[in-house]
Amino acid sequence: TVNANGEVKRQRTSYTRYQTLELEKEFHFNRYLTRRRRIEIAHALCLTERQIKIWFQNRRMKWKKEHKMASMNIVPYHMSPYGHPY
């Protein structure tokens, strides 16, 4: 794809179900990877180190957003069903 400046745009990476599952499993245990581990995962999943790095960056942002939203749903003090504090 070419953008307005005539530059070729890089295509969006599509991950297979297997790759996504393996990346999610790794993320569950480690939100941050060492370079050595990133190389191992890239090799095992036939992806580049850069793809692994960016996937983890994006996943951390998603995790942060999810936890931020979850904490906003917690009421700081007990509310009665009528909207007044007890």
Curated annotation (Swiss-Prot):
One Gene Ontology term of the molecular function aspect: RNA polymerase II cis-regulatory region sequence-specific DNA binding
Main location per the UniProt record: nucleus
Entry's localization field: Nucleus
GO CC terms, sorted: nucleoplasm
Presence of keyword Cell wall biogenesis/degradation: no
GO BP terms: anterior/posterior pattern specification; positive regulation of transcription by RNA polymerase II
Domain of life (superkingdom): Eukaryota
Protein's UniProt keywords contain Calcium: no
DNA-binding interval(s): 8-67
Keywords tagged on the record: Developmental protein, DNA-binding, Homeobox, Nucleus
Database matches in SMART domains: HOX (SM00389)
Database matches in Pfam families: Homeodomain
Function per UniProt: Sequence-specific transcription factor which is part of a developmental regulatory system that provides cells with specific positional identities on the anterior-posterior axis.
UniProt family annotation: Belongs to the Antp homeobox family. Deformed subfamily.
Official protein name in the record: Homeobox protein H55
